[in-house]
Amino acid sequence: MSSNYATPLDDEVFPLSFANYQFTEHVSLGEHYSLNTSEDAKYNNLNGPFVVPRDTGKFDLNTSSASDETVFSLDNPQENNYKHQAMNNVQDCRMAVAAKTTQSCDKLTDLYANAAQQNYRLWLSSF
């Protein structure tokens, strides 16, 4: 696994990591959340599906020290403005978290969104 990808935190972590998201065994493949919304045309090229843990409706960016700033809640996607759904650069983001700033984590990029979709499809094809 590339160093740019998250590593499991424990045995319960779902064996799927893309765009540096971690998913637990509670993920339901039938429950998708698509970033392709009519409300925010700026991100209309970021097609889902993105799966989320069914029990919490939240997922954490797997930075070296996750905090409240790196939690995205599906309860209010407009307020969150999708700012933590993908990273501009994983290493920059980790350094930003270490420096107690999320400036480098606030950029949503096609690069990681597309990597997310590709890895998700690859994982599905492994069955």
Curated annotation (Swiss-Prot):
One of its GO terms (cellular component) is fungal-type vacuole membrane. It is a peripheral membrane protein. Coiled coil: none annotated. It is found in: Vacuole membrane. Induction: Induced by amino acids starvation. Disruption phenotype: Invasive growth defect with elongated cell morphology. Its main location: membrane. Keywords: Membrane, Vacuole. Present with 4050 molecules/cell in log phase SD medium. Required for viability of cells lacking mtDNA. This is Interacting with cytoskeleton protein 1. It comes from Saccharomyces cerevisiae (strain ATCC 204508 / S288c) (Baker's yeast).
